[in-house]
Amino acid sequence: MPKANNAVASRARRKRILKKAKGFWGARGNVLTVVKHSVDKAEQYAYRDRRAKKRTFRSLWIMRINAAARLNGTTYSQLINGMAKNNIQIDRKALAEIAVKDAAAFSAIVQAANK
């Protein structure tokens, strides 16, 4: 009895893995055994960096808020403390956006926080 290959499924599996390696250089993009390792590692980096991105953006927002706060004569920590005491609930993402786009509104927030 002849060996059953199930070539359709095998080809689909290989094609799916090779498709994920599109744009990879050299053997990493066209040799299946190397591609498997490259794609696995790429997915590990992607998983890790989706989480790191959240930390990176939060630190970016804090830097922007701190820079704008110092232009208004206060510091980031004093501003956040003042906002908490005066029950001003604006998250860091929105606060950083206001600091960059609308300096007058940010100054008003700083004044309200320093009451």
UniProtKB/Swiss-Prot annotation:
Pfam families in alphabetical order: Ribosomal_L20
Family from the record: Belongs to the bacterial ribosomal protein bL20 family.
Biological role stated in the UniProt entry: Binds directly to 23S ribosomal RNA and is necessary for the in vitro assembly process of the 50S ribosomal subunit. It is not involved in the protein synthesizing functions of that subunit.
Gene3D superfamilies in the record: 6.10.160.10, Ribosomal protein L20
TM regions (residue ranges): none
PROSITE patterns according to UniProt: RIBOSOMAL_L20
Gene Ontology MF annotations: rRNA binding; structural constituent of ribosome
GO CC terms: ribonucleoprotein complex; ribosome
Tree of life domain: Bacteria
Alphabetic keyword roster: Ribonucleoprotein, Ribosomal protein, RNA-binding, rRNA-binding
BP term (GO), one: ribosomal large subunit assembly
Species, as recorded: Chlorobium chlorochromatii (strain CaD3)
UniProt entry tagged with the keyword Ribosomal protein: yes
Listed name of the protein: Large ribosomal subunit protein bL20
